[in-house]
Amino acid sequence: EASCAGVRIDMIVRGICCVRAGVPGRTENLHIRSLVGRYLEHGRIYSFYDGVNTRIYIASGDFLTRNTECRVEVGVRVEDPVLKEKLDSILRLQLSDNVNAREMQPDGSYQKVKPAPGEPLVNSQMGMYDLLRDDWTARDKAPAPASVAETPKPQPVKAPEKPAAPAKIGRASC
């Protein structure tokens, strides 16, 4: 519906994708990319822009039916501006990949994304590696925040006298 209303939709789908992108009159505004490279990653980052505001969410699952109907998954809106910017930069990096990216065609096949003449090569997986390495290096060099440094060590807890009865757990049909 959003595609038919003229909304541009960019999706990064690592595996199975049941919707066809670029079908005239249906999904011509839907662009689906697959990133397959050295690392098996899928961020489960969801970004929505209404022309004024960007809302970013992270989730434990994707939108496969088994995840939305048969599992307990969680999604949360990211409010912290620093985290929002970091997640947005990850999405922009992945959407600009022209080394590992394949784009879905209207027939369901995928075509390798090629850089335009003179455009630099963008490998989002190596970019993510560099970003995380730099982040961890900076974290290692920074002094621990006072709240972390002063956190008391956990004390051993005595076991209960009588063990609790085991809970009865049913089986899901999924």
Give each language-model segment a name.
Residues 1-173:
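PLD/PLD-like phosphodiesterase catalytic module centered on the HKD motif
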